[in-house]
UniProtKB/Swiss-Prot annotation:
It holds the Pfam family RuvB_C. The gene is ruvB. Residues 1-167 are annotated as: Large ATPase domain (RuvB-L). GO terms for biological process: DNA recombination; DNA repair. This is Holliday junction branch migration complex subunit RuvB.
């Protein structure tokens, strides 16, 4: 029998974030009783913590369809109008990385979020006219890894704003245990702990390690976490090669470094540095942001010495 990772099918199977789950379930029940459309929801937090999974479970709980679109794909009014024209009453529209939606499209989004209608320009030049387009009522779920880029007029239109943050070690251990059982890995408690310690408190990374561990087992007939972490270039505390390169780049400087200098030293883009590398290093107090730029902390230097 082919073994594969099975994502949660309902809120009961979703590990962690119980207060957020309770709030969502309460709102769904209230909307049913009131026979009203569920309020729009904004989910924000780092990558890999379950924002898309929550959107899927919300749609499932509401017994409706989930439509998914990337914010970066909404760059022209026609992109948005095509998307909402396909929505049926009660559907859930999930816009991932909603901060990437073009400003011209956001102007159309606001009236749709308010009362499900939008003014559309039909025709050209002297023959053009504004026509009101009605949209079927739906629930809008936006997700972002860059909450600071969400403009106030957009933020104000969400009835629920939920922070999906990093997970506790206990929650990650539970996730590793569940998926390890699905893959019949028979993980020992110390192995679960090791995987947790190398997961950056992020479910997506933990699940990725479990998948690679399964591959290792079916090929080599045994589990060797040390060899796996080495092959994946995952270091202590879950830091990856690019994270260590970042720390080494700062460690070799005598003055704070600006984001442009760091990008130049690493050869990667600003968005990757700010959204994929720095959040966890800041959380672990390995780096600090100052007015003059980024600096490595004593914790960061000690990490480089030990890894």
């Amino acid at each position: 029998m082919k073994l594969q990772i099975k994502p949660p099918n309902n809120f009961a199977e979703f590990v962690g974030k119980q207060e957020i789950i309770n709030q969502i379930q309460l709102s769904i029940k209230a909307s049913r009783i009131n026979k009203a459309q569920l309020d729009h929801i904004l989910l924000y937090g780092p990558p890999g913590v379950g924002k898309t999974t929550l959107a899927r479970l919300i749609a499932s709980e509401m017994n409706t369809k989930l439509q998914i679109i990337q914010g970066g794909h909404l760059q022209r009014p026609s992109d948005f109008l095509n998307a909402v024209s396909l929505i049926k009453k009660g559907d859930v529209l999930f816009v991932d990385e909603i901060h990437a939606v073009a400003p011209s499209v956001m102007e159309l989004m606001f009236p749709v979020m308010d009362d499900f209608r939008v003014q559309v320009l039909i025709g050209k030049d002297f023959n053009s006219k504004m026509v009101e387009m009605k949209v079927n009522p739906f629930t809008w779920i936006g997700a972002t890894t860059q909450f600071g880029k969400i403009i106030n007029p957009l933020e104000d239109r969400f009835g629920m704003i939920l922070n999906i943050d990093y997970y506790s070690n206990q929650e990650i251990e539970r996730i590793v245990s569940i998926y390890g059982e699905q893959m019949e890995l028979e993980l020992k408690p110390e192995e679960i702990t090791q995987i947790t310690q190398h997961s950056k408190q992020t479910p997506r990374i933990a699940i990725r390690i479990v998948k690679r561990l399964f591959e290792q087992k079916i090929v080599n007939k045994k589990i060797d976490l040390a060899a796996l972490f080495k092959s994946l270039m995952i270091y202590k505390n879950g830091l990856q090669s690019i994270d260590v390169q970042y720390l080494k780049a700062l460690n070799g400087q005598y003055e704070p470094q600006g984001i442009k200098s760091i990008c130049s030293m690493l050869g990667i883009d600003k968005s990757t540095v700010e959204n994929k590398i720095e959040p966890f290093l800041l959380r672990e107090n390995m780096i600090q942001k100052t007015k003059k730029g980024r600096i490595i902390t004593r914790t960061g230097r000690n990490y480089l010495t030990s890894c």
